[in-house]
């Protein structure tokens, strides 16, 4: 790659940049990755333009510059590059490097979807589901999620599963919800893993199975997903699908608290109030209840009120 890159072969330059980014066969270096991405981008290679744009977006090897990131994504998009089109849409959707504009986001998502981007199909589906930048149309959202899901997009699979769960835009079907949650869960998506675990927990679309529920909650928890860690705490507290263990419950609640879960703050507060899995500490319980209460957790608000009483 280096020999070809030094002879200004843009594909080789981009590939060499990726090797420096990933540290494969060379010492990892964002600065060298940027150097070679830039060389290929300046020759007009869309893939390199997108890779360099990403470096500017997240400040890897260069100071973060969202405006420059957008400019580079736009260059790739103007060549019809699916990733470039999708990333321009995201810039407009979230106001990164440009003024937020949902209508513009929809237009670019549509172009990216037409170019075959499954991620764009999913995000365009979200726009139709929520009525952001376009009139709300659940049937269209379902169609787009299905296209994305069948192309293997995990978010599209999970979103389609949720519409089957809720019966919005499609006939309600727990079996179809489980089918699509499983597809996304097997790709490692924490939200889908938790949704599938919940189906096993309550026997929705599958036979109730606590061990399978714990399996999927743990998969999400091991990725530090707040809901997954909170639900593992519940399972350990009550011995659902695992042996009852207060210390393990506290461990998972604490992880979920660190990830911002108000429900976990409340439940960990209960552990401190009662001395379950930890030494009893009313002051720590009150502190946790207050944190959760300030995040509008109703149970914590009630528990905090009781302590004041």
Question: Where do the language-model regions lie?
Answer:
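Short helix-capping/linker turns of helical repeat alpha-solenoids
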Residues: 6-9, 22-24, 29, 37, ...
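Hydrophobic face of amphipathic alpha-helices that form TPR/SEL1-like repeat modules
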Residues: 15-22, 51-58, 87-94, 123-130, ...
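Low-complexity/repetitive intrinsically disordered segments
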Residues: 1-7, 298-309
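Alpha-helical tetratricopeptide repeat
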Residues: 73, 77, 84-86, 189-192, ...
């Amino acid at each position: 790659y280096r020999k070809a890159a030094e002879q200004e072969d843009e594909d080789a330059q981009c590939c060499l940049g990726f090797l420096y980014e990933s540290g494969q066969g060379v010492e990892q270096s964002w600065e060298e990755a940027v150097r070679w991405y830039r060389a290929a981008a300046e020759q007009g290679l869309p893939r390199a333009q997108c890779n360099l744009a990403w470096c500017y977006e997240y400040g890897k090897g260069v100071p973060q510059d969202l405006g420059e990131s957008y400019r580079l994504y736009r260059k790739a998009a103007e060549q019809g590059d699916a990733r470039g089109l999708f990333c321009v849409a995201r810039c407009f959707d979230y106001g990164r490097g440009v003024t937020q504009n949902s209508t513009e986001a929809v237009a670019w998502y549509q172009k990216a979807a037409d170019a075959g981007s499954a991620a764009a199909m999913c995000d365009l589906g979200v726009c139709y589901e929520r009525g952001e930048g376009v009139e709300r149309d659940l049937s269209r959202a379902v169609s787009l999620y299905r296209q994305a899901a069948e192309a293997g997009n995990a978010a599209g699979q999970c979103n389609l599963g949720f519409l089957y769960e809720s019966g919005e835009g499609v006939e309600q079907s727990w079996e179809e919800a489980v089918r699509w949650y499983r597809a996304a869960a097997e790709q490692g998506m924490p939200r889908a893993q938790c949704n599938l675990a919940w189906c096993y927990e309550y026997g929705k679309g599958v036979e109730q199975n606590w061990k399978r529920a714990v399996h999927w909650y743990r998969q999400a928890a091991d990725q530090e997903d707040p809901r997954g860690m909170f639900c593992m705490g519940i399972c350990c507290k009550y011995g659902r699908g695992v042996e009852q263990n207060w210390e393990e419950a506290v461990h998972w609640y604490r992880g979920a608290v660190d990830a911002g879960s108000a429900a976990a703050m409340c439940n960990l507060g209960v552990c401190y109030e009662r001395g379950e899995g930890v030494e009893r500490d009313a002051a720590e319980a009150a502190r946790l209840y207050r944190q959760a209460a300030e995040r509008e957790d109703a149970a914590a608000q009630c528990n905090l009120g009781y302590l004041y009483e």
